[in-house]
Curated annotation (Swiss-Prot):
Residues involved in Ca(2+) 4 binding: D164, N166, D168, K170, E175
Species annotation: Mus musculus (Mouse)
Top-level division of the source organism's lineage: Eukaryota
Domain EF-hand: residue ranges: 16-51, 63-98, 107-142, 151-186, 195-230, 235-270
Gene, per the UniProt record: Calb2
Protein name: Calretinin
Length: 271
């Protein structure tokens, strides 16, 4: 049995498989909060520097603080002082690089919601393992990337392990949305405004005046504005248009049904 001193290096500049990428992530994201930050980030950066020196890649500056600042400016895309898993995927070369593959083909939040609508076939608010497999298969075909059944199974299991935070074998919309680029992830904007089922039912009933069970685009506009005002958050016209377009991707023929909007706005998807 290998002792502590015999552990393999966690960071190197060779090509990585999806599983190896996940191992590196989990090693540095010690508290499992979905980010590398603080001491975790320092440890990650020190390992990265060692790997670069070992492969002959040298930084311009010898000062650790300056190097770290330069590194963060390059890779911390949303400037929050943390590195997210998807940001890390751009730093570490991976053989499959499925996260970048995903982003290439589902680049906007509206496209993401359309894809979600297609694969959440039972409208449960989750994509389960078998639905996720179809999702990834489609993406790989679009990218013209050859794969076999075992490889597809590995991708599916790896993404489940990455994003299935509660380990129930399925991914909720907010979990899956972490695959989106940060600037496109409109669902992050709703994180602090998640509603209970009772709160959601009250606000939906208010805007669904005729009790039809759905609202249209204009009613959604008013509902989103109302939600933002109640939470004392600012939203400009451009943001409103983007959010509305993304949410309306779940609609059928311009009709946004209660269950679909509940997936976006509720703290727990409908059961």
């Amino acid at each position: 049995m290998a002792g502590p001193q015999q552990q393999p290096p966690y960071l190197h500049l060779a090509e990585l498989t999806a599983s190896q990428f996940l191992e590196i992530w989990k090693h540095f994201d010690a508290d499992g909060n979905g980010y590398i930050e603080g001491k975790e980030l320092e440890n990650f950066f020190q390992e990265l520097e060692k790997a670069r020196k070992g492969s002959g890649m040298m930084s311009k500056s010898d000062n650790f603080g300056e190097k770290m600042k330069e590194f963060m400016q390059k890779y911390d895309k949303n400037s929050d002082g943390k590195i997210e898993m998807a940001e890390l995927a751009q730093i570490l070369p991976t053989e499959e690089n499925f996260l970048l593959c995903f982003r290439q083909h589902v680049g906007s939040s509206a496209e993401f919601m359309e894809a979600w609508r297609k694969y959440d076939t039972d409208r449960s608010g989750y994509i389960e393992a078998n639905e996720l497999k179809g999702f990834l298969s489609d993406l790989l075909k679009k990218a013209n990337r050859p794969y076999d059944e075992p490889k597809l199974q590995e991708y599916t299991q790896t993404i489940l392990r990455m994003f299935d935070l509660n380990g129930d074998g399925k991914l909720g919309l907010s979990e899956m949305s972490r695959l989106l680029p940060v600037q496109e992830n409109f669902l992050l904007k709703f994180q602090g405004m998640k509603l209970t089922s009772e709160e959601f039912n009250a606000i939906f009933t208010f805007y669904d005046k005729d009790g039809s069970g759905y609202i249209d685009e204009n009613e959604l506009d008013a509902l989103l504005k109302d939600l933002y005002e109640k939470n004392k958050k600012e939203m400009n016209i451009q943001q409103l248009t983007t959010y509305r377009k993304s949410v309306m991707s779940l609609a059928e023929a311009g009709k946004l049904y209660r269950k679909d909007l509940e997936i976006v706005l509720c703290s727990e998807p409908p059961v």
